[in-house]
Structure formats: C-alpha cells, structure tokens
Curated annotation (Swiss-Prot):
One of its GO terms (cellular component) is cytosol. Belongs to the UPF0246 family. It comes from Marinobacter nauticus (strain ATCC 700491 / DSM 11845 / VT8). It holds the Pfam family H2O2_YaaD. It comes from the Bacteria. This is UPF0246 protein Maqu_2499. GO terms for biological process: response to hydroperoxide. InterPro entries: YaaA. HAMAP family: UPF0246.
Amino acid sequence: MLMIISPAKTLDYESPLATETHTQPDFLDDACELIDQLKELEPHQVSNLMSISDKLGQLNAERFQTWHTPFTPDNARQAVLAFKGDVYTGLDAESFSNEDFSFAQKHLRILSGLYGLLKPLDLMQPYRLEMGTRFENTRGKDLYAFWGSKITEALNQLLASDDKVLVNLASNEYFKSVQKKHLDARLVTPQFKDWKNGQYKMISFYAKKARGLMCRYAIQNRITQADDLKGFNLDGYYFSEDQSDNNNWVFLRDEQ
C-alpha cells in the first residue's frame, strides 16, 4: 500500500528537526532543468504566473535564483518537516519516532510541481510551484506536460513490490499528474465529510486535515493492507459502508 498527498504552500525552515535522517529526491535532475527555466523569470513575471502579490513574487523569484545543488542539511530540509498546512497539521510528523519515519519512507509519497515525487525524508530547498501552474517549458505547455509519465512510472515501480493499492489523499490538481489509465494498481480515494446544516458534506479545511490524519493513522499503526484503513477513527471520523464503493471510501464525522 502506498499513500500520496499534496505539498503545501506554507513552508517551515526554522523549527527544530524531529530527525537528522535524510535522503535525496529521485527527480533532482528534472528539478534542475525546471529551475534553470524558472530562473529566467523576473519577479513581476513570477507574480503573474502564479497570481500572487508582488511581495510573494519577489520572494519566490529569489528562491529560484538561490536554489542550487547539492542539497545538504545546511541548505535544505526534509520535505515532510518543511511543508506546513492543513494536511501536515493532521500528519504531525514532528512527533514521529524513528520507526514512524522509516515506515513513512516506504508507504508515503508527496507529489510536487518542482520535485515530481518526494519521499518524506527527501531534502528540498524552499520553492513555490503548484502543479496546476501554466508554466510553458521545454517539454510542453504546463507542468503536467513536463512530468508526463514519469510520476506514474515511479509509482508503478513502487507498487510492483507491494500489494498494488494506491491510496489517493492528494488534491485533484496534484492527482492529475498521475496518469490513471497507465496506473498498474487498484486506486482507493478516501473522502471525508462532516455533518453541517442537516447533511454530510466535504468541508475543505477539515477534509485536508483528515487526509493527514489518515496518513498518521496508517503510519503509527503500521498498516500495509489498504482495507485496514477502514478502521480509521481519529478526530471522530468513522467509515460509512453505505456511502462507499470499491474505490471511493467515505468517512463521516458527526457535528463537532
């Protein structure tokens, strides 16, 4: 079983590290190729490309300019500890044990516009480049064209030595980088719904946090068979047999 999640826009390169263990991204050469093209952008072009403020455009243009290899613990940080956002609040990797990190390295991957596919402990330098960004590059009109089949092929390789179940806990924007028709695995997509105004509905903030919580549940309980995820019960969620089918698993939570 392999779980995939999205990255986050917010980054933390200041907090104490929960582990010194680190690895290198598998697609660093591809990231270098992208960075070389991104370095050609002026700050105002970065702002326009990403629909962000002038201040953020300046910050991210500077990040592109200072980005360099090799990655070391002095100039980079492990991805799962660098990303901050609702998913990562639920995941709470800062509290992981060494054994938790080791399990996560085998069963969790982070999709990324710049790095393609990251292992939790892969070092990365700060960046902002969402997968849906329409950045024309040497390989095509956007980042989906840039990554092509690479991410899917990497996932297939990882799944070949496993029970061939991919648990999709990523956003639609990021999951679009996976070519479903070429995926050699069963795909399971958990959905999280909260009771509000007389019905169960997906509330973005809660659903994102729940994706991280499910990863945490799988990691801390050493879950390797996807069906065991149906026991997920953190923060009051429970599996709904009635609302689920083979590939879409619905977890409900009653009013908080």
